[in-house]
């Protein structure tokens, strides 16, 4: 939860923490620091207008980093203008909720995003997805194809290791694990 209004941040945190493992930050820079310290979120809920690094900059940074480009992002903001909404979606937001909002709406949006991702995993190629439902970049798709090709080629080798797969895709073991788990919901181990 990335929100500069401490009262609202605590409210969202308290309402989501019974269902999810939640971290909070007062701006985009703090959020990136939490991620840099090793905690990989399943979703980011961010305000638009914040000091130091606003929501658009945060989205852009997350989308341009291969290790975080798969993370769904929901933007919450007091801005109600269509152009702001369109801009957020173009930057890569998966959802947009105008303030004031009900916690029920936010939870429903989060659940919807997670459910759509599960559907993609269960039925690839059979799910109709609108751009605001899920963001999987070309690089993410290439990674999945590369992993699948490698697995098909090495499935019979009893000595194969996760480290070999990570080396093949050009990532560290932990980064690859987090990326594959975030994209597919499945562990590469």
Where are these regions (language model features)?
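Charged docking surfaces used in two-component/phosphorelay signaling
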Residues: 10-14
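A Lys-centered signature of the CheY-like receiver
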Residues: 97-99
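Receiver (REC) domain active-site loop signature in two-component systems and cognate sites
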Residues: 50
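C-terminal output helix
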Residues: 101-110
């Amino acid at each position: 939860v990335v929100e500069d209004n401490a009262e609202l941040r605590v409210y969202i945190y308290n309402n989501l923490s019974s269902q999810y493992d939640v971290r909070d930050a007062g701006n985009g820079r703090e959020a990136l620091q939490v991620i840099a310290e090793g905690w990989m979120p399943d979703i980011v809920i961010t305000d638009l207008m914040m000091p130091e690094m606003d929501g658009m900059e945060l989205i852009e940074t997350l989308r341009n980093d291969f290790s975080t480009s798969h993370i769904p992002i929901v933007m919450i903001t007091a801005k109600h203008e269509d152009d702001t909404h369109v801009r957020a979606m173009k930057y890569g937001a998966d959802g947009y909720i105008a303030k004031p909002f009900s916690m029920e709406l936010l939870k429903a949006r989060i659940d919807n995003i997670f459910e759509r991702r599960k559907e993609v995993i269960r039925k690839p190629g059979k799910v109709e997805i609108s751009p605001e439902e899920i963001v999987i970049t070309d690089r993410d798709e290439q990674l999945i194809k590369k992993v699948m090709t490698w697995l098909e080629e090495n499935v019979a080798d009893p000595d194969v290791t996760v480290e070999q797969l990570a080396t093949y895709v050009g990532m560290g073991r932990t980064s690859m694990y987090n990326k594959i788990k975030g994209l597919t919901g499945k562990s590469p181990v």
